[in-house]
Amino acid sequence: MSKVFFLVSVSLDGYLTPPGMDMAHAGDPTYEDWGAQWGKLHSWILPTRFFRETLKLGEGGETGTDDQIVEHTFRRTGVSIMGKRMFDLGERMWPEEAPFHTPVFVLTSQVREPWVRPGGTTFHFVNDGIESALRRARAVAGDRDIRIAGGADAIQQYLRAGLVDEFTLAISPVMFGGGPRLFAGIGRDVGVDLVETLASPHATHVRYAVHKGAMS
């Protein structure tokens, strides 16, 4: 059976995105530097060879630990699930060929027809909850895994429901001082076991297996 996982970049102080990176603050000059902060958070991804080639940003790029993690994550993912806030922001920012190349199920109250993009990405809009989205994802994942792409609220919902098998944090050397906390509202009933730690010049990658039960 497909595993359910997430892999996200987090700041050293535990935030998933910088303050102001949402539609509510679009155009607000107070938060105009969020793009630069987001770039720092993802400095381990953006220059890698696999990322650049996959998104058709040009040849070349960095190889090594970060590149291997990006490629492995992309190849193991057969379908993604994301929240509406992540989709709303991405709809404005992603290139025409969205960077998933798989089906994507969007958690939303909005009724909308599937949105087909070049390159193999089709966004499907799910109105009846996280378990329905997961059932639909399993039906199309094949022998690959299911990634909870974000944002924080979607990840938290799946963690609280006991539906996540493993996750990896790419901890970047940047402080945000605010924004959505990745594990806000997650209690002791979500237990984790450390599986692997890998370091690169840009981030520390920590992988955990998830189990139900109080954390020791």
Give the predicted meaning of each segment.
Residues 1-216:
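Enzymes that bind and transform nitrogen-containing heteroaromatic metabolites
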